[in-house]
Amino acid sequence: MNLRIYAALLFWIGVVAVSCNRDDISFETPASGLRFSADTVFCDTVYNQVRSESYAFKVYNDADQDVVIPNIKLGRGAGSLYRINVDGKSGTEFTNVPLRGKDSMYVFVEIAPTASGPEAIATDKVHFTTGSGVDNVTLFSVVQDAEFFVETTGNPNILSGTHTWNNDKAKIIFGDLTLASGSTLNIESGTKVYFFKNSGMTVQSGATVNVNGDLNAEVVIRGDRNDPYYDTIPKNWNSMQFENGSLLNMNYARVFGGTRGLDFREASATIQNTIIHTFEEYGIHAVNSTITASNLVMNNCQFANFGIFKGGTYDLTHCTLTNQWRPVAAPALIAGNEWINSQGQTETGALNLNIKNSILHSIAANAVIFAPISGQTFSYLMRNCLITHDSNGAGFDITGNPAVVAPTVNEDPSFMNTLISKMNLRVNTDSPAKNKGNTADAATVPLDLVKISRTANPTLGAYQ
């Protein structure tokens, strides 16, 4: 009896072993075409000689029977800028690739391009040969030529003297880039500045950065990942830090996606026609600094869009500061006399803050939070501003406050679109911000962010 059981067990083990031998499975060439999850794969914009991240599409066998795909190859063969990975193997051409009935497989794609000009298009096709002919999936990517600034042990990555960055090449910063004391960096219109993860820039005392963008030719400062997904998430890079006595002149820039955007330590700045959004901490972090801003748009920062510490002097005219950060709502602007330095010591300074013809909005109860201390100057004026306000926790009252002139309180500004992926902070025609501006203040900034005149019936915020 035991011998019979043993013999039967050996028989079934043999059957299973034979049935699991892949070489004995019957695969046929597909009689009909395969199905694909996409007919075109759009890869991230990539930089000259930098390998992209991997992208994928799926190949489906909708038939009941198992099939073998006779040939899968890149159209440009070994000369292609792309590489594909099929069934765990990387290359440019594959033969006799099996695919079971009612099953699918991934094909992974990456590109390691070369570029001979500022921007080029790289295309290829993945050809799938079947019994019914050849199916194709198109591969598409934009390739940018790039100049690299890489910090290493032997290269501290310091710029000295006067430098000008043009839009002929993207600027890629790996590690920290330092602009030496007394030096000047000019960043011209249309230039794109990309920071790798955990990278940033330090502008030393007495150094100057001039950002000279223009409408439709803005200077872009962001993380190095160009996929649209990364446009909406923070902490892809660190910050641009301006040390004591340094200077920033910024016009028409888009700064987004880092930990802190512009970090000022007793520095000076003039910021015009600029959009700053999506930062892990602050879009602007200012310690006892002097900042003049107009047509400034800010949104989506976890601690606050604009953080002011240890006082300073600030003048904001026709700015749109809304904070749509989720899940924990945060203010648009916070200001105080104190700052805790890196040694844990508390430093204090006098504050002078003027905000005119602006939108100060948040999904939190208070768009503006003040933290004055006794014994220090805390001077402010908010004139003709739309403001989200709750006296609890704001640090100031609006009713009967001579420093708050002609406010529009707790009304929805009616933005066109607050989604970060589609952000448009123009206001609709029925917005309570329409025609609410002080004309004398509007005359100091006569054109809005898109160069529309606002000298008559000025709208609050950066857009007329």
Feature-to-residue mapping (PLM):
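Beta-strand/loop edge motif enriched in small/polar residues
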Residues: N21-F27, L34-T45, V50-S52, A56, ...
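Contiguous beta-strand segments of beta-sheet-rich domains
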Residues: I69-L74, A120-D124
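Short linear motifs in exposed loops
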Residues: F108, T455-N457
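Short acidic/proline- and small/hydrophobic-mixed sequence motifs that coincide with surface turns
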Residues: S52-E53, D64-I69
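Bacterial N-terminal signal peptides that target proteins for export
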Residues: M1-L9
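C-terminal motif of bacterial Sec signal peptides marking the signal peptidase cleavage site
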Residues: V16-S19
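Short, solvent-exposed loop/linker segments at beta-strand-coil boundaries, enriched for Pro/Gly
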Residues: K73-E93
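Asparagine-centered strand-capping/turn motif at beta-strand->loop junctions
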Residues: V59-A63
